[in-house]
């Protein structure tokens, strides 16, 4: 993909690298997954490279199906394939974005264990605060394996919000 044009509709290769970590950890051939998604493996060596959002989406879907985890192994509890579809079905008829976000956050709290989000609204500004699970013995926060977990969570919520508002 041309890296000199506009960035609109593209994803940094850094996110591709992050998505591939779970494949490397499980010994799955990442090259085959990249090719299946229409992403040249050679782009991994180009730090400024970008891929189309549709190709990244194909990679995301392929990895989720292969691992049976739509959260890429980023939580101690996998988010089984089909969970996201069920989430969308549960949100499609909500009448406000606030209700949809609250329902989505409850859903994620059911399927993920390591952290959760809480919607806070103050002076017309909405914010999602992420809270890590605490260890039951020490009381200390149990942090996700990688910061990519937080980003993935927020990207999914943002994407859902855009989809719902666009309907």
Which ranges hold each PLM region?
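N-terminal low-complexity or simple alpha-helical regulatory segments
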Residues: 1-133
């Amino acid at each position: 993909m041309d890296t000199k044009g506009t960035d609109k509709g593209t994803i940094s290769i850094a996110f591709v690298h992050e998505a591939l970590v779970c494949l490397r950890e499980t010994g799955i051939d990442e090259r085959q997954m990249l090719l299946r998604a229409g992403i040249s493996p050679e782009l991994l060596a180009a730090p400024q490279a970008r891929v189309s959002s549709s190709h990244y989406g194909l990679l995301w879907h392929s990895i989720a199906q292969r691992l049976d985890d739509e959260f890429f192994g980023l939580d101690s509890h996998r988010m089984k394939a089909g969970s996201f579809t069920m989430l969308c079905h549960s949100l499609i008829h909500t009448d406000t974005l606030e209700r949809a976000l609250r329902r989505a956050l409850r859903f994620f709290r059911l399927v993920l264990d390591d952290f959760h989000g809480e919607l806070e609204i103050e002076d017309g500004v909405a914010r999602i605060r992420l809270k890590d699970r605490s260890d039951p013995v020490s009381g200390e926060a149990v942090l996700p394996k990688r910061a990519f977990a937080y980003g993935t969570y927020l990207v999914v919520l943002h994407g859902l919000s855009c989809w719902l508002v666009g309907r």
